[in-house]
């Protein structure tokens, strides 16, 4: 007598569950990195919004703005914020965004990234990456900060991973002067 088998055997179900588990184990870390990079992109967008004011100040005064007020952007720094960004601060021409300490991917909580300009060949070139500091407003030199508030490089956009080639924008000096 032949009987038709209905449904799946226990072995077949266990194989399917194992395959789903393996796929989830691979996909979850990739998804977490993706969400962290998306959250970091908000910080870069907010920081980039301050570049034109900082560049204009530099071209008009010959030195970098000391803070948000002198740059002509929102002050205090906590006024420039987003869903994932706590504040955006201008200090001696370096624009630094600080991530929130809650409501963001745990790998970037409280971490910082910087955008900074440098005068090169008659224009201002902007760089992005790990937090940097500039000792004085009239200097072009910057020093990379080595501390626990650095965002892991894997979460930065590819243009911000290498400080030597991380040019975000080049602004010619004539871009801020009106022809009269």
Swiss-Prot record:
Q: Which residues are tagged as glycosylated in the record? A: 70
Q: Which Gene3D superfamilies match?
A: Glycoprotein, Type 4 Pilin
What are the recorded Gene Ontology BP terms?
Answer: cell adhesion
- Regions crossing the membrane: 8-28
Cell location? Fimbrium; Membrane
Disulfide-bonded cysteine pairs: these are 128-160
Q: Which InterPro entries match?
A: N_methyl_site, Pilin, Pilin-like, T4P/T2SS_Core
- Does the keyword Disulfide bond feature in the UniProt annotation? yes
Q: Which GO terms describe its cellular component?
A: membrane; pilus
User: What SUPFAM superfamilies does the record tag this protein with?
Assistant: Pili subunits
What are the N-methylphenylalanine sites (modified residues) in this protein? 8
Q: Which residues form the propeptide?
A: 1-7
Q: Which UniProt keywords apply?
A: Cell adhesion, Disulfide bond, Fimbrium, Glycoprotein, Membrane, Methylation, Transmembrane, Transmembrane helix
User: What's the protein's topology in the membrane?
Assistant: Single-pass membrane protein
Indicate the quaternary assembly.
Answer: The pili are polar flexible filaments of about 5.4 nanometers diameter and 2.5 micrometers average length; they consist of only a single polypeptide chain arranged in a helical configuration of five subunits per turn in the assembled pilus.
**What protein family does this chain belong to?**
Belongs to the N-Me-Phe pilin family.
What does the UniProt record say this protein does?
A: Major component of the type IV pilus (T4P) that plays a role in cellular adherence, microcolony formation, resistance to neutrophil mediated killing, twitching motility as well as transformation. Mediates the attachment and the formation of bacterial microcolonies on host epithelial cells. Mechanistically, pili retractation induces host NF-kappa-B activation in infected cells, which is temporally associated with the formation of gonococcal microcolonies.
Q: What is this protein called?
A: Type IV major pilin protein PilE1
Organism, as annotated: Neisseria gonorrhoeae
Q: What is the lineage of its organism?
A: Bacteria, Pseudomonadati, Pseudomonadota, Betaproteobacteria, Neisseriales
């Amino acid at each position: 007598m032949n009987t038709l088998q209905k449904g799946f055997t226990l072995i077949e179900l266990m194989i399917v569950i194992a395959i789903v588990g393996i796929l989830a184990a691979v996909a979850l870390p990739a998804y977490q990195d993706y969400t962290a990079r998306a959250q970091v992109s908000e910080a870069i967008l907010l920081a980039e919004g301050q570049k034109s004011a900082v560049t204009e100040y530099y071209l008009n005064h010959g030195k970098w703005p000391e803070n948000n007020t002198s740059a002509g952007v929102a002050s205090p720094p906590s006024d420039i914020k987003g869903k994932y960004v706590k504040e955006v601060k201008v200090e001696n021409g370096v624009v630094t965004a600080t991530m929130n300490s809650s409501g963001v991917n745990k790998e970037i909580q409280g971490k910082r990234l910087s955008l900074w300009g440098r005068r090169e060949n008659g224009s201002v070139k902007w760089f992005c990456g790990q937090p940097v500091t500039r000792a004085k407003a009239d200097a072009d030199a910057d020093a990379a900060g080595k501390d626990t508030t650095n965002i892991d490089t894997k979460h930065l956009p590819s243009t911000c991973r290498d400080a030597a080639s991380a040019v975000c924008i080049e602004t010619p000096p004539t871009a801020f002067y009106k022809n009269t």
